[in-house]
From Swiss-Prot:
Keywords: ANK repeat, Repeat. Pathway: Secondary metabolite biosynthesis. The keyword Transmembrane does not apply. Pfam families: Ank_2. This is Ankyrin repeat domain-containing protein oryK. ANK repeats lie at residues 1-27, 31-60, 62-89, 90-119, 162-195, 202-232, 500-530, 534-562, 568-598. It comes from Aspergillus oryzae (strain ATCC 42149 / RIB 40) (Yellow koji mold). Ankyrin repeat domain-containing protein; part of the gene cluster that mediates the biosynthesis of oryzines, natural products with an unusual maleidride backbone. The two subunits of the fungal fatty acid synthase oryfasA and oryfasB probably form octenoic acid. This fatty acid is most likely activated by the acyl-CoA ligase oryP to give octenyl-CoA before the citrate synthase-like protein oryE catalyzes condensation with oxaloacetate to form tricarboxylic acid. It comes from the Eukaryota.
Length: 625
């Protein structure tokens, strides 16, 4: 047994033996822990006393032995260690005692009078802030509330930094739960309402913490305080205004927007609210685009200006800020971070709800520039000219990223419904692969695949452009072409080139696109038994990818033919057997329309094929029965 294990178990005889064998009574192990630390951590007061009598614990300890003892609730060990502690370095221990509910230990520490820091120099109290405070669960404020309310009316000999910490914990509690403690602390003038506390290497303040949590009631109380500084910055060096905007649903209500407007202010020029490692403004900008009104959008622009780089482009467009937009696009030093697709989707949803011709004209100007520079897909401009804000949303997502369900659902209606019941041929591949108006699928990029700030892409934006152009001469053909692009964009594959010979139904079946299969089967123009040059039908494609729901949907079609053969002579039952999905085999057999006499090009029927190929026994048995 080594000295560390002996200390942990409180074995004084073993500790003595280890020391006699030459062990260092204060020597750390490979993790930097001393024998005294193990005795404290395990709650062994006699072992602690014996080790200290041998000189242990004289040097600095990391972590603090007192904080370890407090964290375990060992009051007797706290009393033993206290005479050897430096109070200015033990403020975390007192915070821990109150936070964990060990209030008797907290009373013992406070009664020493050492935590009032009356004799401290200014630099000493600053060290309390720089040392930082422990991060705690959001419910810890309740322990501080109980501790302070029970001692209400007493003059606690504590330095202000402890009340500052209590105020911060109260503002960080979820759903305004800490409001009563906030009002009590401010009413008693205990804390500094503008205090800064280091948590996990980041400065936090009560105002910014409440904003980050979206605690509107607490925010209103803090804003009304006569000494509040609305420009003070906390985590990420952000003011409360940005933290509130980034909080989910914080500005979804009018009250939230009112408080956001009260928090807003104009920053000094060149003030950066982001660092070089990570753009943190996406959540704030997304909420503003979704819930903010024009005034709030402009307040964000006034605060952030060019510090967000291209990330702010959708906000500038919506606010019709021509000068700011021109500066961002022309600035060589602008951040190359691209706005996420959701920003552009929210901007399109804004145009769908409101007839903002000025902002739409500016959007068109920007789109023309980006299309001309081959930064954006030409389909975006076509959709803008047609004011088709539902259809346009898909094109802002890269091919490697499937658009959200709400985006793809909108593109199916109403244009696609019209297409289904038109006279267009929906069974062949693209009927006009090289015709006029055909978009070149080979060069469809992500909306921002390149940085528009290079010198070769300087622009001068007009304040407004006409937002509409003549409709396509053949709307059905135009819709069909656009839908083909939507399909390849949504499913991240470019299958509708001129050389692609699959019909849309086969493609949808193979791509597991059940909504599109259902939509196509509603059209009288769709041939459910269409065979491509390899004689494969949509049913064969669905079975090949083991998509049982789509197979079942196709089998329910009144015109389905289960016994069509591909170029190798294989029917649907061959595909199902080879695919190894017993449920699909049983589904086909259950129709009672399977022709088991059909032979493939090798002269084998499906039962003979299954035995020769040594397929699963359950498959062979199902076919034999």
């Amino acid at each position: 047994m080594d000295i560390y294990e002996a200390a942990s178990q409180g074995r004084i005889d073993a500790i003595k033996f280890a020391v006699e064998q030459g062990c260092d009574v204060d020597g750390p192990n490979e993790d930097g822990k001393t024998p005294l630390w193990f005795a404290v951590q395990s709650g062994q007061p006699e072992a602690c006393r014996f080790l200290m009598s041998l000189g242990a614990g004289r040097g600095p300890q990391n972590p603090s032995l007192l904080e370890v003892a407090v964290g375990g609730g060992y009051a007797d060990i706290v009393a033993l260690l206290w005479p050897h502690c430096n109070a200015e370095r033990e403020h975390r221990s007192l915070k821990t005692a109150i936070s964990l509910g060990f209030h008797e230990i907290a009373d013992f520490l406070i009664e020493t009078g050492a935590f009032e820091y009356q004799d401290s120099e200014v630099s000493g109290t600053e060290s309390l802030i720089e040392d930082g405070s422990p991060e705690r669960e959001s419910t810890v404020f309740q322990q501080w509330e109980r501790f302070l309310f029970v001692r209400r009316g007493q003059k606690l000999p504590l330095h202000r930094v402890f009340f500052d910490y209590a105020l911060l914990l109260a503002t960080k509690a979820g759903r305004n739960a800490g409001l009563r403690l906030v009002e009590f602390l401010l009413g008693e003038s205990m804390p500094d309402v503008n205090c800064k506390i280091m948590i996990n290497g980041q400065f936090e303040t009560p105002l910014t913490a409440a904003a980050e949590k979206g605690n509107l009631e607490i925010l209103a109380t803090l804003i009304d305080h006569p000494n509040i500084d609305l420009t003070i910055c906390g985590k990420y060096n952000w003011p409360a205004f940005l933290h509130l905007l980034a909080s989910p649903l914080s500005i979804s209500t009018e009250r939230g927007r009112v408080i956001a407007r009260r928090l807003a202010y104009k920053a000094v020029y060149n003030r950066l609210f982001i660092d070089s490692r990570e753009i943190r403004l996406q959540g704030a900008f997304q909420n503003v685009l979704r819930f903010g009104d024009d005034g709030l959008v402009k307040q964000v622009i006034d605060l952030v200006r060019g510090a967000a780089g291209t990330l702010i482009l959708p906000l500038l467009i919506r606010a019709n800020e021509v000068d700011g937009l021109t500066w961002v696009l022309n600035c060589d030093g602008v951040s190359s971070k691209k706005p996420p697709p959701a920003f552009w989707v929210l901007l399109c949803q804004y145009f769908k709800r409101y007839q903002d011709q000025d902002a739409l004209g500016l959007f068109t100007s920007v789109t023309e520039f980006l299309v001309e520079k081959k930064i954006w897909n030409q389909a975006i401009l076509k959709c803008l000219h047609a004011c088709n804000f539902s259809f346009i949303q898909q094109f802002f997502y890269p091919l490697s990223e499937a658009p959200p369900k709400e985006v793809t659902e909108e593109t199916l209606s109403p244009g696609f419904e019209n297409l289904l019941f038109s006279n267009a041929d929906l069974n062949g591949s693209d009927p006009h692969p090289n015709g006029l108006g055909r978009l070149e699928l080979e060069i469809i990029p992500h909306a921002f695949f390149d940085d528009p700030s290079s010198a070769a892409q300087k622009i001068s934006l007009r304040s407004a452009l006409p937002s509409a152009s003549p409709n396509p001469s053949n709307p059905h053909l135009y819709s069909y072409q656009m839908e083909l692009i939507r399909l390849e964009q949504q499913n991240k594959r470019r299958l509708f080139f001129a050389g692609d010979t699959r019909c849309p139904l086969s493609w949808a079946a193979k791509s597991h696109n059940a909504p599109l299969v259902n939509a196509l089967l509603r059209s009288p123009q769709v041939n459910v038994n269409f065979q491509d040059p390899s004689d494969r039908t949509p049913l064969l494609y669905a079975i090949a990818v083991n998509d049982r729901p789509i197979v079942e949907r196709l089998l329910n079609h009144r015109d389905i033919d289960l016994n069509l053969r591909d170029a190798e002579g294989r029917t649907a039952i061959f595909y199902a057997a080879q695919g190894g999905d017993l449920s699909i085999v049983q589904l086909l057999i259950g129709t009672q329309n399977v022709d088991f006499s059909i032979r493939n090009k090798n002269g084998k029927n499906v039962k003979e094929f299954a035995k020769k190929a040594k397929l699963k026994q359950d498959i062979v048995a199902a076919l034999s029965n």
